[in-house]
From Swiss-Prot:
This is Large ribosomal subunit protein bL20. Belongs to the bacterial ribosomal protein bL20 family. Disulfide bonds: none annotated. CDD domains: Ribosomal_L20 (cd07026). It comes from Paenarthrobacter aurescens (strain TC1). InterPro entries: Ribosomal_bL20 (IPR005813), RIBOSOMAL_L20_CS (IPR049946), Ribosomal_protein_bL20_C (IPR035566). GO terms for cellular component: ribonucleoprotein complex; ribosome. GO terms for molecular function: rRNA binding; structural constituent of ribosome. Binds directly to 23S ribosomal RNA and is necessary for the in vitro assembly process of the 50S ribosomal subunit. It is not involved in the protein synthesizing functions of that subunit.
Length: 222
């Protein structure tokens, strides 16, 4: 059987490795074994850094956008919130480029964001409308509770509150919005504004109220 020396293939393999390692210092660029070891490490570093590069550039863009937006009287967070509310689809890379190269265009975007921002700085513009719509269910709940208490025949031991003074024989407070009742001496009894008064726990439960904090908290102590 013929002998295979693989000289050509071996030399080519070494040339490729040394060509890739020619930028390294010392033996890492001249000796095949050292160059091969260093290349294995370099491949690991390059794989991880290609992914870190995305985060590094994102942080750089945010710093540039923040500096330019503060120069126009707006913070980075408020700028992004305003652009989203105005439905302006510009990514951070282009915003950073405009902040560096075109100050007038960036200032125009800041003005658009300012105009789209809600008056309430703690609430986004898109969520303001649904919150207003939630008022109606709360009012309907209070009306339903009032109907339960005042319907005929009336529930024994339940009266609507008229002022802060408790009627004689009625010591349990009822809150229509939360539909919870509070017995004297409980945690939130003194801070709760009574909308209904009940003479017994059973009367409060019959009106559709639940114990605030659970049964253990709402027990009348003799």
């Amino acid at each position: 059987m013929a002998r295979v020396k693989r000289a050509v293939n071996a030399h080519k393999k070494r040339r490729v490795v040394l060509e890739r390692a020619k930028g390294y210092r010392g033996q890492r660029s001249r000796l095949y074994r050292k160059a091969k070891e260093q290349l294995l490490h370099s491949f690991v570093y390059s794989y991880g850094d290609r992914r870190k590069k995305k985060g590094d550039f994102r942080r750089l863009w945010i710093q540039r956008i923040n500096a330019a937006s503060r120069a126009n009287g707006l913070t980075y967070n408020r700028l992004i919130q305003g652009l989203k509310a105005a439905e302006v689809e510009v990514d951070r890379r282009m915003l950073a480029e405009l902040a560096v190269s075109d100050a007038n265009a960036f200032a125009a975007l800041v003005n658009i964001a300012k105009a789209a921002l809600p008056a309430d700085t703690s609430a986004p513009a898109a969520a303001a409308a649904p919150k207003a719509a939630k008022v109606a269910p709360a009012a309907a709940t209070a009306t339903a509770v009032k109907a339960v208490v005042s319907e005929k025949p009336a529930i024994d031991g339940a009266v609507a509150a008229d002022g802060d003074e408790a009627p004689e024989g009625y010591a349990i407070k009822g809150n229509a919005e939360s539909k919870k009742y509070h017995v004297p001496g409980s945690t939130w009894y003194n801070t709760t504004a009574a909308e209904y008064w009940f003479s017994t726990v059973e009367a409060a439960k019959a009106a559709g109220f639940e114990p605030a904090g659970g049964e253990a908290r709402q027990q009348i102590k003799n």
